[in-house]
Amino acid sequence: MLANIVNKFIALILAFLMSIGIITPTPIPPGGIEASVELNFANDEKASAAGTLTVTSNYDAEYSVYWGTLGGEKLTTYSESGKTVPYTEFAKVTVKDGEGEKELNSFLAIPQNAKTILLYYDDQLVDTETLPLGKTFAYGAETYSFGSLSDVHFNRYYDEAGNDISQTSYPRALNFLDDMGVSIVGVSGDLSKEGEDSAYVSFNKYNSEHDFNVFTCKGNHDCKDKFNYETWKENINVGVFSDNKPDGVLAVSDNGYDFVYSGKETHGDVFIFFSQITDKYLPFVQLVTDEQLDWLETQLETYKDKRVYLYFHTFLNAPSGNPFLGEGNIYNDYGLFYILPYFTGNKDEKRFRGLLTEYKNVIFFNGHSHWTYSMEEYNENLNITDYDGTTATMVHVSSSAAPRTTSITQPIQHSNPGTMSEGLYLNVYPDFVISNACDFVNGQILAYATYKIDK
């Protein structure tokens, strides 16, 4: 770790000295940059980008790699209203002494309509490689699409004028997902700062502007002192716990929070929303009750032959090795991490983990840490993992309000309200799901966090 920190600091110092003219940057060769990119695939599976990227060049620098069209243009897609939605780079590779490599996430997807790999130095296209025919294919007819959000946090982050940033970030996220044509949106909790009524009223107000259902569970901030159940029931998951339930509500728990939904728009897929009951992350303090876990186990057993999306707020530590290198967390240059995971070894945590190990048909959405998707550089499991096929597929949902970053010059986690806002747009097909991480501020898909889930 120390060597890594030293190398990063040296690189930063050199970059700074170059920027102020003390050190002259290495000039580009007189004949220009001559570079090539190669993706050595790890498997023959269509649409899987798993493998190793190798960039060779006569000029040492950082290069960006994009998916492209046959015409050599960066890949884009379109919203239902006709807006162009660009894909970002899917990898960055640093070339040193003429060569650089990057191992790609085993879940990384080749987007539909991608035909080439484009290598860029800054804004200059320096190489184009055609994807093998066996790796590109038309996904076929999409069954439906949906959105996943988390950590909305009304009343927590304010701009310099005193405006609640979530009054902008949340409706913008919903508008983006609506324009992409989603049929339903699931949220992994933390709608508020301290459980205050106004947060839930705002959440309901923006949801009511759209024709699709928006369902959620509770997060730790929704378990704080200002929480009032009647306000929650009136504004959140509206009607689910009434005598006049929305069509598609298959089961509700006696606790007034947890429920199962499978409507016409989900085409047989099952959505489960499962709420924690406390904001305390301590030994022997249960996030969920035994009765909740009994109920959850019953639902998972009932729908074990279905594709199930389980929404919960808090992520779990890795089952082995460094506990902070599991889905939902990172371990930065200084050994720092997000300090509030589901407390490993607690009675409820062990049972919950056991259920996620047994029912591998589940896709488990959780938020809580706010880590931005690019922080995958610190942990390949941050955004998605199934721990080599031993568990349900666990999927990190960043924050629509304030994604967090860290770096060599930013040892402590830094929140980015206003300048960043992220979430997921998911395309569902008969045999797989494509999970697209989204940058709602710039209206783009983060290609480095676009994944294929075979379920």
Name what the model sees in each region:
Residues 135-200:
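N-terminal active-site segment of His-dependent metallophosphoesterases
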Residues 19-30:
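Sec-dependent signal peptide cleavage junction
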Residues 197-303, 351, 357-358, 374, ...:
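Extended active-site neighborhood of metal-dependent phosphoesterases/phosphodiesterases
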Residues 175-184, 270, 283-388:
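His/acidic metal-ligating clusters that form di-metal
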Residues 151, 189-190, 219-220, 313, ...:
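Active-site glycine-centered loops adjacent to acidic/histidine catalytic or metal-binding residues
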Residues 108-125:
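Beta-strand-rich modules
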Residues 29-58, 127-136:
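Pro/Thr/Ser/Gly-rich low-complexity, intrinsically disordered linker/stalk tracts
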Residues 67-113:
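Recognizes extended acidic, P/S/T-rich segments that occur
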